[in-house]
Amino acid sequence: MATNAAAPPCPCYDTPEGVDILGRYDPEFAAILTRDSLAFVAGLQREFRGAVRYAMERRREAQRRYDAGELPRFDPATRPVREAGGWACAPVPPAIADRTVEITGPAEPRKMVINALNSGAKVFMADFEDALSPTWENLMRGQVNLRDAVAGTITYRDAARGREYRLGDRPATLFVRPRGWHLPEAHVLVDGEPAIGCLVDFGLYFFHSHAAFRSGQGADFGPFFYLPKMEHSREARIWKGVFERAEKEAGIGRGSIRATVLVETLPAVFQMEEILHELRDHSAGLNCGRWDYIFSYVKTFRARPDRLLPDRALVGMAQHFMRSYSHLLIQTCHRRGVHAMGGMAAQIPIKDDAAANEAALELVRKDKLREVRAGHDGTWAAHPGLIPAIREVFEGHLGGRPNQIDAAAGDAARAGVAVTEEDLLQPPRGARTVEGLRHNTRVGVQYVAAWLSGSGSVPLYNLMEDAATAEISRVQNWQWLRHGAVLDAGGVEVRATPELLARVVEVEMARVEAEVGAERFRRGRYAEAGRIFSRQCTAPELDDFLTLDAYNLIVVHHPGASSPCKL
């Protein structure tokens, strides 16, 4: 005889009023998405979302002025902040005095987090931003990974290799990079609106890990963060408010949280003093985010045919505007008593070619020697294999000192070196070629395909690439097409046009298919990536961020994930 058994209750997240979770339910995720942690995140959203909206509108307003011909400049209204000698940032916490080598990588996969913490670097920056594709699974597993890393319990078993991964005796100090202010989190709704992504990243991590971090590797300070994509000190002011609210709710002292700001937009280079001043109780210095800085240079001057970039490979730190940016950052940080961090070494070991591998390492050594001689206190590496070479360069130059903040050392500190607005805006020089267009397309399409498939940190042609790669590639292609740049095609001049790009995309897609194999090409999202990349490069107006355009393609909603369950 049949019986009508009651349906088992569906698993769902226990959410406070006004919060809805649209991501897939998972018991591990539920331990992160608790009622109290979500209430904390919702409180941040409600207090600061108005200020964030205002800041984003001011960004758009500034871009309209640049499009009309105005140049970025130092703000006359804040000259007293820049010129005042009577203020400094809070003293550097002992736990992060030595930051000579920092390794960066996504907060997920778990094995990668363990390897980075065990890499021998002084700091591991776990990334929720450019190195992570922000799928629901990646974001939540990243939170689980960081909670376990701070607790010292993170492990991973590779069943295929029969290998167990766990933390070593002296793991790197953890910094966390949340997303930029512009990115939403569509799987978390607060009062019916998508949450601000960075406040979800920050809020969940801080809520679950601040106490364990401070009692462990933070030595009564922390947690520590990297803050990306800012364009103005008003955006730093919002972070200041977020930090102060978090400290108050956690019952920890003001200034416990510390953050390094990535100077990776052209407008921000004119706001470095002001950014440090806003965050002076919470500052852990500034970092040269040089790849996104190049992207921002193109975006800022998108309407200016006199600002065309040469091939991406030629836009390095030898360019005057890039060298000036580095020198001003060092001067600013050391004047205010904080770290001036160098840029990324993106090379990865070349296992099957010893000569090529040594040549790549030599390029890294030269770049890092330039940085430490200029006055940088530390630098970034994308792969553990680079760390011994970088440590040798920095430690050899520093001679036992943890940094050179107080040493007045380096090229940037020489008397008479004054960086002007003209220095920071000098157009870069070099050739523009069809091969550059092809390389941008080949790399850009492959990165977008990987990002759509859930990978945000991608090895391509012996470099570890993140979203900055795709951004530089697509904005440079767009710039060349928009202004009809003349490109060198092996001694023949051709004009950049949509028709030329269409031919290049066709050829490069075939090349990528040959490189990765027909089956992987078919199963991957290469065709979709090619369409997105082509559309971005030929759009009448330049989109602010490629990742905003592509984000909806990785959002997967599960409407019954929040309480009360919807049966």
UniProtKB/Swiss-Prot annotation:
BP-aspect Gene Ontology terms: glyoxylate cycle; tricarboxylic acid cycle
Residue stretches in coiled coil: none
Subcellular localization: Glyoxysome
Top-level taxon of the source organism: Eukaryota
Catalytic residue positions: R177 (proton acceptor), D466 (proton donor)
SUPFAM superfamilies, per the entry: Malate synthase G
Regulation: induction: By submergence in seedlings.
A Gene Ontology cellular-component term: cytoplasm
Pathway assigned to this chain's UniProt record: Carbohydrate metabolism; glyoxylate cycle; (S)-malate from isocitrate: step 2/2
EC number: 2.3.3.9
Aminoacyl-tRNA synthetase among keywords: no
GO molecular function per UniProt: malate synthase activity
Locus of motif Microbody targeting signal: 565-567
Catalysed reaction equations from the record: glyoxylate + acetyl-CoA + H2O = (S)-malate + CoA + H(+)
Keyword vocabulary terms for this entry: Glyoxylate bypass, Glyoxysome, Peroxisome, Transferase, Tricarboxylic acid cycle
Family assignment from sequence similarity: Belongs to the malate synthase family.
Protein name: Malate synthase
UniProt organism field: Oryza sativa subsp. japonica
Lineage of origin: Eukaryota, Viridiplantae, Streptophyta, Embryophyta, Tracheophyta
